[in-house]
Amino acid sequence: MKPGKKIIRVAAMAAAVVLLLGGVSLAEGFLLGEEGTGATVKVAENTSLNVRITLQGRLDAGDLIKSDEATPTSYESESDFSFRRIRLAFTGNMVKNLTYNLTIAADKNSVAPGNASNTLRIWYAWVNYKFADPLSITFGKIKLPYSRVSLTPATKQLLIERPFSTEAAKTLFDDYIQANLSLNGKLAGGTIAYSLAAADGWEPGATVSGNRVHKSGLLYLGRLELSPPGWVEKSKSDAALGKGRHLTLGVNAAAQNGIEYASNAFEEDRTLWGADLSGHWQGLTAQVEYNAWKEDYSDPSKVMKEPKGWYAQVAYFIPGVNVEPAIRYEIYEQDSNKSDTEQRTITAGINWYLKGHDVKLSANYARTEFEKNANGFLANDDKQNIFQLQGQMMF
């Protein structure tokens, strides 16, 4: 049996098992009870501390490695067990309207087997002061405000992995989660929401495009979200578990100019813009997002690079059995200034919620096809098939 067909058969069997087992929870609510909020200690009237632990165990199988040759020509099957995410989060209020978060992570650093070192590091560290709904200020190590699917917590993703294009866009300004200062607010009952931020981006000493950075301008970012009255999302989630409704249009832009190299007189500018539309009504959820970015070099030996990509995903939460089949289609053009650099990915999956997002099991099958000039294309193999199983627990 061909590897691709074998993976599809295993995925189908896993989905059938989930549906079968889900039948034991036909009663209202989740099999293991409702979602929790972690452990909270209230020190004083406006002072509190909440502690949450997140664990994501993962099995990846399929075309995970390349052939053992000087120049690989095909993909080979392999499997890999890992803890994709291990998080310990401390969140609370120091005084009224002053919120803080410190998250320690020991995530797996790569989805490829053999590259998994669960290195302990600070993931988030920020403080936020809310003056009023229209204005709050945040400083610390936190996500940069662009890309809807990237801003959504990993624990509330619809599918196990985020799209390739948005993952690539997250590296445009060095770390996606970096120290930044932002102004945020909501107007008109949340129908208008905004975020304006400034960060270092590529800073002195970092290596960008093969060159060490001497100095650079600041990175500026902005995001705007618009929702109709009565359709405002309380917090970002790919999967609302059949509750409520929302409809949100988001647009974002970012730019960092004057990234000067230390070894020569050249420099580069980087810009990004994107738009997304997301919505859900009870069990039905859908989302589409587009991002395009540019790396503009003053070095005449380098050609301006302009990647772009989009995806669309849809799912339906089935109450009673508490399962959610989902599908996503994506096109990522690695450089629109070159021909045949597209990769197309279709991902099909199913989630089984035993305690909402606190305890859930997910199974995904992803198939990617590469054009001849795209990274990932091999002489004897232009397709990659991967099957994933993941269990998530938060407490």
Q: Where would I find each of the regions flagged by the language model?
A:
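Bacterial N-terminal signal peptides that target proteins for export
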Residues: 2-12
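Sec/Tat signal peptide C-region and signal peptidase I cleavage site
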Residues: 11, 21-27
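Cleaved targeting-peptide boundary
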Residues: 27-34, 208
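Outer membrane beta-barrel
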Residues: 34-204, 214-230, 238-243, 306, ...
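Surface-exposed beta-loop-beta
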Residues: 202-304
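Outer-membrane beta-barrel "beta-signal"
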Residues: 219-231, 382-395
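Conserved active-site loop/cleft motifs that coordinate metal ions or position small ligands
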Residues: 289, 324-328, 349-351, 358-366
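Predominantly the C-terminal beta-signal and adjacent terminal strand-loop region
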Residues: 355-389, 394
